[in-house]
UniProtKB/Swiss-Prot annotation:
Keyword Cytoplasm appears in the UniProt entry: yes
Subcellular location: Cytoplasm
Annotated protein name in UniProt: Glutamate 5-kinase
Origin species: Shigella flexneri
SUPFAM superfamilies: Carbamate kinase-like, PUA domain-like
Pathway of action: Amino-acid biosynthesis; L-proline biosynthesis; L-glutamate 5-semialdehyde from L-glutamate: step 1/2
GO biological process: L-proline biosynthetic process
Length: 367
């Protein structure tokens, strides 16, 4: 076994249930055994788990509930405790303690809360405790949800300072086409950079019963790889898959980490779910992508959403393509007022100014 590494393992609903309506406990037992074996060898393991709603539905005897957010949150509230009890029970067989962390998008958007979550997660790891992470589905609304556990796992990998992120699913990896519809589809074993062609392939693929399909796994891989974290998509049903990944054995699709990873602050900017969105003109797009310039108010065409100064926002071109994420120097209302104006007009329009740029290049990361 190699020197100690930190591995984040994301377990989707399709892996935990085997495609059924209930948790597949026999399979979860095997996954815990693999993790415990690595833990005993000195590796640090983080679990990102789905399955709270499935656990709640099973515990309540599959009640007939309306298809509403309130119903899902009811099931999550019941299932969350059942789920953590299951992880606790199974890891205790090996003398391993677990610690639960429930996160929402707000924990990632706010830099101080992000750092606090990081410190908590690393304290658990430093004390040989296995963190079990899930989104706080019992209280999270659409506005504060990360949205899927694929992207949550990438953020967890950044928080943990992980070496590898393993996304376990019901497929062997990323294929050249959806293997369920195209028998000629081939497994892509290595990816050295994510481009629009790969995104198009992932957009046509599906992955099990959960919130995230292959497209969200690609998003997660992009975030993690740019933070210097190797990411693997593999089948959760493959025997010994977790150990194989830690040994460097070829499994599924390996997304190779960026050779020069982002600095810590830019990892947060890149990984934080955007609080809003602005659309910029062709001149601003070229300045950002080709010259690495800051974004000036003059180049802003429209502002979407309500956000505060200091929050991370998405920057899109006129075609709607996501070209960058950055920390806004002004809130959404102020940006709407100064959009299309020259920087020297800011003070006259607002009665104050926080500098001539809307998003500074030091607070921006291109996609």
């Amino acid at each position: 076994m190699s020197d100690s590494q930190t591995l984040v393992v994301k377990l989707g609903t399709s892996v935990l249930t085997g495609g059924s309506r209930r948790l597949n406990r026999a399979h979860i037992v095997e996954l815990v055994r693999q993790c415990a074996q690595l833990h005993a060898a000195g590796h640090r393991i983080v679990i990102v788990t789905s399955g709270a709603i499935a656990a709640g539905r099973e515990h309540l005897g599959y009640p007939e509930l309306p298809a509403t957010i309130a119903s899902k949150q009811l099931l999550a509230a019941v299932g969350q405790s059942r789920l953590i009890q299951l992880w606790e029970q199974l890891f205790s067989i090996y003398g391993i303690h677990v610690g639960q962390m429930l996160l929402t998008r707000a924990d990632m958007e706010d830099r101080e809360r992000f750092l606090n979550a990081r410190d908590t997660l690393r304290a658990l790891l430093d004390n040989n405790i296995v963190p079990v992470i899930n989104e706080n589905d019992a209280v999270a609304t659409a506005e504060i949800k990360v949205g899927d556990n694929d992207n949550l796992s990438a953020l967890a990998a950044i928080l943990a300072g992980a070496d590898k992120l393993l996304l376990l699913t019901d497929q062997k990896g990323l294929y050249t086409a959806d293997p369920r519809r195209n028998p000629q589809a081939e497994l892509i074993k290595d990816v050295y950079g994510i481009d629009d062609a790969l995104r198009a392939i992932a957009g046509d693929s599906v992955s099990g019963l959960g919130t995230g399909g292959m497209s969200t796994k690609l998003q997660a891989a992009d975030v993690a790889c740019r933070a210097g974290i190797d990411t693997i998509i593999a089948a959760g049903s493959k025997p010994g898959v977790i150990g194989d990944v830690m040994e460097g054995i070829s499994v599924g699709t390996l997304f190779h980490a960026q050779a020069t990873p982002l600095e810590n602050r830019k990892r947060w900017i890149f990984g934080a779910p955007p609080a809003g969105e602005i659309t910029v003109d062709e001149g601003a797009t070229a300045a950002i992508l080709e010259r690495g310039s800051s974004l000036l108010p003059k180049g802003i065409k429209s502002v979407t959403g309500n956000f505060s100064r200091g929050e991370v926002i998405r920057i899109c071109n006129l075609e709607g393509r996501d070209i960058a994420h950055g920390v806004s120097r002004y809130n959404s209302d102020a940006l709407r007022r100064i959009a299309g104006h020259h920087s020297q007009e800011i003070d006259a329009i607002l009665g104050y100014e926080y500098g001539p740029v809307a998003v500074h290049r030091d607070d921006m990361i291109t996609r």
